[in-house]
Amino acid sequence: MRPLTANRPKVMLPIANRPIVEHLLLELREAGIGEFIFIVGYCDEQVRSYFSAGEKWGVSIAYSDQRKQLGTADAIRQVGGMVDGNFIVVNGDVVVDRVDIEKLMTGKHNTMSVIEVKDPRGLGMVEIAGGKVVNIHEKTENPPSVMANAGLYLFTPAVFDAIERTEKSPRGEYEITESLKILMQSGDGLYCQELRSWLDLSYPWDLLAANESMLAGLEPQNLGEVESNVVLRGPVAVGRGTVVRSGAYIVGPVIIGENCDVGPNCYIRPSTAIGDGCHIGAAVEVKNSIIMKNTKIPHFNYVGDSVIGEGCNLGAGTKIANLRLDKKNVRVAGIDTRRRKLGAILGDHVETGINASINVGCTVGNNTFLGPGVVASGVILPDSQIF
């Protein structure tokens, strides 16, 4: 997820103007869960500050610190004294549905949620027989299955015994997959439940798919000021203190945060999320993108299929390409994104000069300056100055 996680934990990356983990919390709450334990480590103060004890969401949140990254099994071991009876464990970087959670909660046995996938890259794949998991393949090429471990589990207290029997892996972690294999071979085994929907957020461009999914159910709302001669088509949500100026043409689903200045005469296209304090100015077009808070895209810019970090400033005439001339899939750092259209991934506090051009799949690190007329492509490291 770098450069987007250089200043924040992955779970706090925004989709539809909420952190990933907030979407997860809301689905779990709607499924009837009211007590949460957040296992935190990197940049934990951001999670604590945002969620506190959970009062805003009508739930109770406790915290467990994993200061050394020793694996998921180690993280679960830490909360052994904080849970009683069966409990749900879910990775903080997935999107799951309330209905699937409710179904999982009716179980009585150790259960792994699984999902059929077309692209197994980077995923743990499982083999299933008779409603149980019989084999696990951790991120292997050409796995003999299309079912992936979805990172959502129902555990009984027996999992803690399995974790105690789990040895440290060659990479120095206590892998939950090894604990799951122990459960497979003992007692009632490891049951499985197939999910109806699921999104895994492994790469920056995965945020765009999740953002589109979350915005699909957006309810129109206007808490700001919309001037005359503004066109709003489809569901558009405008935050408090935001001004949408004359001539703006916005096609939803689009969500605009608080205290933004939008327009005049701009075009915002579907599946766009604009964070708090942003400026989208004259003759600007934004399409299917995530714009994080306090970013300025002020005049004569095109931003499509991109993720733009906090506090960025695009100079006049800066354009981001989002389609290869040969129409092939865009690659980022050699990785096939499986997307024909993908713009750029900009970290926090990136600034560009006038008429800078950013090529498809370009990744720009934090605190980077791209000078006037620069053509940027590939991977640009943080704190770079390119003229």
Language model features: what each stretch is:
Residues G281-F387:
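Glycine-rich hexapeptide-repeat left-handed beta-helix
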Residues N110, D119-P143:
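Anionic-ligand binding region
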Residues G92-V95:
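The conserved acidic donor/metal-binding loop of glycosyltransferases
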Residues L13-P14, R18-V89:
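Conserved N-terminal catalytic core of the sugar/cofactor nucleotidyltransferase
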Residues R98-R121:
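Conserved donor-nucleotide/metal-binding helix-loop-beta segment in metal-dependent transferases, i.e.
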Residues I182-P270:
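Extended, small-residue-rich solenoid/repeat segments and analogous flexible loops
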Residues I88, E102-M105, K132-A216:
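Catalytic-core segments of class I nucleotidyltransferases/pyrophosphorylases
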Residues M1-A6:
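N-terminal nucleotide-binding beta1-loop-alpha1 segment
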